[in-house]
Amino acid sequence: MSATPIGFFGLKLVPGKVHRMDVSRDFKITNVSYADQPKSNTKTLVKIHYTHVPGFEDDYDEEEQEKEPKSTDEEEEIEEKVYTLCSLNGANKDHAVVDLQFCQEELIGFSITGDAPVDLVGNYVAPPDFFDQDPSDSELYSDDEDDDEDMYGLDSDDFDDDDDDDMDEDPDRFEELVESSASKPKKAIEAAPLADSKKRAAEKPVKETAAKKLKADASAASAASTPTKAIETKGEKQTKGAKDTKPKSETVEKKTVDKSTSKMTTTKLPSGLVIEEKSAGSGPPCKAGQKVGMRYVGKLTNGKVFDQCTSGKPFYFKLGKGEVIKGWDEGVKGMRVGAERRLTCPPKLAYGNQKIPGIPANSTLVFDVKLVEIK
């Protein structure tokens, strides 16, 4: 599938200078020409300066290689190489049509020989799709994760059935279940455990109040000769039960609200991506070239879930290599293990005008993501 153009790219090259590129977005060069009318005897070579970064190569045996450290002689050095893109001359070839695409984070530069400036023009392009096949509608909307393929090409055989039993099936949230001390309050992110604790907290005061009421009624029956005292006792117990119940409920709600709001920070990047920080995580931040393992829930803006990976084997990809949509490459960068974010990706950082099963064209996508591993 050819890359989808999403914007104009242009660069003017002047003699005697190497134009270094900070490749923040994928782009393609389609035409090379003189910037002005050249002299008939003008000759120009357009050069590409490319630096290979060893950490960016596709390597599926990283863990085994880490166990066997390389010797000094085997370590790969970073070296810049220069290649010729095309040649121009003022007599009969003042432009060249090319088709050359560069990916985000590549270390490249351009230079020219001769004394005539040259224009490079082309397009910024959308990153390639990060799944190989279009899943069917039934697969996208199936609730049984053991029978479907997620949109990233992970087969159900890759998932561990034992892990499925340990994960919360709520499609809106996800969480690695961890044992915690009973004296510490649950985090607001743990949706299912918190709901159960709220339910128990609500049921307990009701049961206590009912028991106290029955006890007060029994006291009133046995002390019929002194009705005034029985009534006072009953009233005091009911009042005390109400006072005991109210602070508990308010405390649980207050802690939940405080935790959910105090950790929420929102940032909007120039690209239009909105990042909501929900949990900071710990350890070093992830960076381009590293393989990261993710949990996620993908939704449309109307709340409809189109894909998720909340249990079993995490979804792995190499950050900054265009293996996922642009919104993920930008939004996951800098996360730490355990960190959680909500990424709101405008169409240009998702699938643009492509129509995908379950995702209409020009859709804004919302992802709740959690980083669980950095390799």
UniProtKB/Swiss-Prot annotation:
Inhibited by both FK506 and rapamycin. Signal peptide: none annotated. Residues 55-78, 127-265 are annotated as: Disordered. The keyword Isomerase applies. Residues 56-66, 131-173 have a biased composition (Acidic residues). The keyword Phosphoprotein does not apply. It comes from the Eukaryota. Residues 217-230 have a biased composition (Low complexity). GO terms for molecular function: peptidyl-prolyl cis-trans isomerase activity. Keywords: Chaperone, Isomerase, Nucleus, Rotamase. InterPro entries: NPL, PPIase_dom_sf, PPIase_FKBP_dom, PPIase_Fpr3/Fpr4-like. Its EC number is 5.2.1.8. Residues 196-216, 231-261 have a biased composition (Basic and acidic residues). It catalyses: [protein]-peptidylproline (omega=180) = [protein]-peptidylproline (omega=0). Its main location: nucleus. It is found in: Nucleus. Binds to histones H3 and H4. Belongs to the FKBP-type PPIase family. FKBP3/4 subfamily. This is FK506-binding protein 4. It comes from Mycosarcoma maydis. The lineage of its organism: Eukaryota, Fungi, Dikarya, Basidiomycota, Ustilaginomycotina. The gene is FPR4.
